[in-house]
């Protein structure tokens, strides 16, 4: 009886699910969310931590950091008690990367804006390095028009979302980006699905890159953005 064989060896081994959810660092292929079974669309990266502790940056990495943000540049923010906290931009940049690697399941509530002259390598760390480390399916490079689009479900299935070549100084752009930065949850629209709208938990960190000095308008008191120094060629564009 083929039906009995299928029921015993197939259906019982692959439980029915109500759809998919993107759940980084959940190593179960089938997982439960609020009592409902979902298939986890997150793909575990090939590269895993070794446990080794390095007390200093590799020379090539330090050279790269010096290109996109000089060592002497600081960043700062004010806390709820109005006290000011200062860090080196390179240190904060690495902390942003570390948070994406070590705790991708936790939402990142600060967006990074990397500005620089064309060809300075400001996108190399994301397009080449991070894509390999976090997994190709966990990184997405998009344009601002993709974010403005009606169907944005796929943008939430990522650990690092990179909006490339942004340059739009209209005030409404920051309002469009706001839901992609701070909230833990956001409503998404899926194309060609029965449940086109759903509430989803945001896991990605947001990065914007641009060749322009002021790619978007940000209020002086807005603490949602990390804006390091504008990178320039150290000698000439051909270097």
Positions of predicted regions on the chain:
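Conserved AAA+/SF3 P-loop NTPase catalytic/coupling segment centered on the Walker-B
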Residues: 158-183, 215-222
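AAA+/SF3 P-loop NTPase mechanochemical coupling elements
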Residues: 151-156, 190-209
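Intein modules and their embedded homing endonuclease domains
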Residues: 1-51
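Conserved catalytic/switch belt of AAA+ P-loop NTPases
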Residues: 134, 174-198
């Amino acid at each position: 009886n083929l039906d009995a064989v299928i029921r015993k060896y197939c259906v019982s081994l692959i439980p029915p699910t109500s759809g998919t959810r993107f759940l980084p660092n959940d190593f179960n292929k089938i997982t439960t969310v609020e009592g409902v079974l979902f298939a986890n669309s997150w793909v575990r990266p090939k590269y895993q931590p070794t446990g080794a502790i390095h007390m200093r940056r590799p020379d090539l990495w330090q050279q790269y950091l010096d290109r996109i943000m000089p060592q002497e540049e600081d960043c700062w923010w004010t806390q709820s008690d109005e006290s000011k906290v200062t860090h080196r931009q390179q240190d904060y940049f690495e902390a942003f990367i570390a948070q994406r690697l070590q705790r991708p399941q936790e939402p990142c509530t600060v967006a990074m804006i990397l500005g620089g002259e064309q060809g300075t390598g400001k996108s190399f760390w994301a397009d080449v390095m991070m894509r390999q480390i976090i997994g190709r399916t966990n990184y997405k490079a998009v344009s601002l028009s993709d974010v403005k689009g009606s169907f944005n479900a796929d943008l939430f299935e990522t650990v690092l979302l990179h909006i490339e070549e942004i340059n739009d100084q209209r005030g409404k752009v920051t309002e469009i980006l706001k839901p992609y930065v701070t909230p833990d949850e956001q409503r998404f629209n899926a194309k060609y699905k029965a449940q086109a709208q759903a509430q989803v938990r945001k896991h990605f960190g947001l990065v914007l890159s641009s060749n322009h000095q002021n790619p978007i308008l940000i209020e002086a008191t807005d603490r949602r953005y990390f804006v390091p120094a504008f990178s320039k060629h150290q000698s000439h564009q051909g270097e």
